[in-house]
Amino acid sequence: METLNTLVDLLKSKAKKTTEDEDLLEFEKGKYFFGVVKNKNKYEGITISRKFEAKYSKRIGFKIIDTIDEYTEKNHARIMRYLED
């Protein structure tokens, strides 16, 4: 049975890991950031954010564009789409 571990393994193989601590893994690929929440070595969800620059202030920010909390073929395809951009 496929689980969130499958999607996290996909991120580990295709995106650059930026941070890791006991309850969060972060990956970066192009303009997208992936935050993986874990609880006692069990993955609970993936948050996908997009990096943007404010028009006038030139500040860098992040906007959450998607969240994934279970493995499905549709979610697998969504992750792949973000990794290919």
Identify what each model region corresponds to.
Residues 29-33:
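Glycine-centered tight beta-turn/hairpin loop motif at sheet-sheet or coil-to-beta transitions
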Residues 34-71, 77:
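Intrinsically disordered, low-complexity regulatory segments enriched in Ser/Thr/Pro
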